[in-house]
Design a protein with these regions (language model features):
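Multi-pass alpha-helical transmembrane bundle typical of ion/small-solute transporters
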Residues: 1-218
Length: 218
């Protein structure tokens, strides 16, 4: 049974709206590390400026894309529910707190050119912080789904359920994937810099047949 009273209706709508607002703010703040780029007259071209800050720029676009996919997954999961109980609330709050912290981890990771494209070099732990945050976001989504499946009264009665290896292990695979990149970054930033490429291919393996949504990460 669900833990505590199930809050539905307007209370549930407000939780979803609150979550969407925090994601919108966090994903906008991601651009701040590169918002102040400028060209000193006679000193550099626009391409040189972009090249000098390629780490921050690549990190911004990748993180923007990943957060968008994570929000899409979160939105799909929450839309399948009719309300929330205590565990759902706190897991969602944890999810939001890490989303809100991502601009910090993204800025630290982007400052190091070692993070992307086989650049090599020392990440100083910023890779572990960045990818560990991604893993925690996926973990919270996975735990929300796991709790809801154990408490079917949280679901809308007309929602279809899928019981395949993809639905059981997809979330854990993403958690392991993100965490693995972080661990590898501690020892070999060059190897870990190619890890993000997997994010574009994992959905081809892990999405349910017939699913039209790309990059589900629950």
């Amino acid at each position: 049974m669900a833990t505590g009273e199930i809050k539905d209706g307007r209370s549930f709508d407000r939780l979803i709206n609150f979550s969407d607002a925090i994601v919108a703010v966090a994903i906008t703040v991601l651009v701040l590390p590169i918002a102040g780029l400028s060209i000193e007259r006679g000193e550099a071209t626009v391409w040189e400026v972009l090249g000098d800050h390629r780490g921050e720029i690549i990190t911004f676009f990748f993180t923007f894309f990943v957060v968008s996919v994570m929000w899409l997954t979160h939105n799909r999961v929450m839309n399948e529910l009719r309300g929330y109980d205590g565990p759902i609330f706190w897991l969602n709050t944890s999810w939001l707190s890490i989303i809100a912290f991502l601009p910090v981890t993204s800025a630290l990771y982007g400052d190091s050119e070692a993070g992307w494209a086989g650049a090599g070099g020392d990440l100083g732990g910023s890779g572990m912080l960045y990818w560990g945050s991604m893993a925690l976001i996926s973990l919270n989504t996975t735990l929300i789904v796991r709790h809801a499946r154990k408490n079917p009264e949280l679901y809308e009665s007309e929602q279809p359920t899928y019981d395949t290896w993809r639905t059981k292990y997809r979330g854990w695979i993403y958690v392991t994937y993100f965490l693995s990149i972080g661990v590898v970054s501690l020892f070999s930033p060059t190897i870990s810099s190619y890890g993000p490429l997997g994010f574009f291919f994992l959905p081809l393996l892990l999405n349910n047949p017939g699913s039209s949504t790309t990059g589900k990460t629950n």
